[in-house]
């Protein structure tokens, strides 16, 4: 089954939708250049209301280690690094927080994909650019065997195609479940339904 990550949770209504739809992951953005950024206090309140079956992920981009360790106190259970963080920094985050790390990479060309596979992290993510809402070139990922999150330009209309073509471990969505810059519960539900339909169709093909 393809895991789902709803990213950019900002409001109690977003948490209510997560608790109803049960994605495997919910992302909370701590990078202050993002319009989806929330404070540690806000994140702590939201995470407290999140069902335990949904893993809260803190999203960071080229931020100092103390910022990440402080945010770890909010209740996040994974760290997502979305910048130019190197292996040494990833290892320090894991050591200081005790949390698993998702390292995100921007898909530019075959070389960027190949280089990303040399990084040691708990999971990797391939994106078209942090929060850009633009789809990456999926053909560059067809030969990747490692489990990964697929992000960038996904919505209910194309996530099924992505799952059929690439079979990622997880799909990550933010702008694709928004209306007017806010999470839209109806779009969140349609996205989950599209993922589950694609999973079911894929399983039938394997039989």
Predicted feature locations:
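Conserved N-terminal beta1-alpha1 strand-loop-helix module at the mouth
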Residues: 1-126, 131-207
């Amino acid at each position: 089954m393809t895991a789902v990550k709803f990213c950019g949770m900002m409001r109690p209504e977003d948490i209510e939708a997560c608790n109803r739809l049960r994605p495997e992951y919910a992302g909370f953005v701590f990078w202050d250049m993002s319009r989806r950024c929330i404070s540690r206090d806000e994140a702590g309140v939201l995470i407290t209301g999140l069902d335990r079956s949904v893993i809260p992920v803190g999203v960071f981009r080229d931020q100092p280690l103390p910022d990440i360790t402080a945010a770890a106190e909010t209740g996040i259970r994974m760290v997502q690094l979305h910048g130019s963080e190197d292996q040494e920094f990833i290892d320090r985050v894991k050591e200081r927080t005790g949390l698993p790390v998702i390292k995100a990479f921007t898909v530019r060309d075959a070389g960027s994909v190949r280089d990303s596979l040399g990084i040691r992290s708990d999971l990797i993510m391939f994106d078209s650019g942090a929060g850009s809402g633009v789809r990456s070139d999926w053909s560059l990922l067809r030969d990747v065997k490692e489990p990964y999150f697929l992000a960038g330009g996904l919505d209910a209309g194309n996530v099924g195609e992505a799952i059929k073509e690439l079979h990622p471990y997880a799909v990550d969505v933010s702008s694709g479940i928004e209306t007017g810059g806010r999470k839209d519960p109806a779009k969140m539900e349609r996205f989950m339904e599209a993922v589950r339909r694609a999973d079911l169709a894929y399983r039938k093909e394997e039989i």
